[in-house]
Amino acid sequence: MISNNKYDYIICGGGATGLLLSSALISDNFFDDKKILIIEKEAKVDNDKTLGFWDSKETILDEVVFKEWEYAEFKDSEFHNSFLLNPFKYKMIKSSKFYSHLGEKISDADNFTYLNATIENIDQENKIVKTDNGEFQSSIIFSSIYDDKEIKFNKYPLLKQHFIGWTIETKDQSFDDNKITFMDFSVDQKNEIRFMYLSLIHI
């Protein structure tokens, strides 16, 4: 357990949201003298996700971008359109590179502490985070941890959205890897809303 359990800021969750927030705090001199704790259940090292985002400018993640596209297409069974994304680009990052890139930045920050622990409770009123490795206090607590209680008690209709992806290799260059396909609705809808992305990479 960490002996000094009081921090200026605690970040609960070391996924994309927590790491990007940590990076932003590190980049701002205002936080140089602030003690910051980031808590994540397990070390993030595997390539367990594919991250995609739009941007029209350089970002702190550009050096780990695996692929980017300037052209895109949209289609369904009766419609097809290709277009230039300018001034935007769509960028793709492998999560293992994302974790290591921002993880190194956090490790180099003297005012940051990274703790692998399971969060058991977040008390926002008293500003206490309880984990299986002790309790920690902070003036401000950030949390990106999913809480299904918010879903269960929401009175409005909710839609569940989930994605699954495959990596497909072809012997021939069967696709245009300069173009990304967004929302291909030509697939069987099966009384739902279904679409496909095609993120094409020439190896």
Question: Which functions belong to the PLM regions below?
Answer:
Residues 5-37:
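N-terminal Rossmann-like FAD-binding beta1-loop-alpha1 element of flavoenzymes
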Residues 55-116, 122-124:
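A conserved beta-strand/loop capping segment in the N-terminal third of enzymes
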Residues 1-11, 115, 133:
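Glycine/serine-rich loop-strand microenvironments at binding/catalytic pocket rims
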Residues 113-201:
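Predominantly flavin-linked oxidoreductase catalytic cores and closely associated redox partners
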Residues 24, 28-30, 37-78:
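N-terminal FAD cofactor-binding segment of flavoenzymes
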Residues 16-17, 43-45, 147-149, 188:
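Short, solvent-exposed loop/turn segments at secondary-structure junctions
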Residues 23, 27, 104, 200:
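Short, well-ordered alpha-helices that flank and scaffold nucleotide-derived cofactor binding pockets
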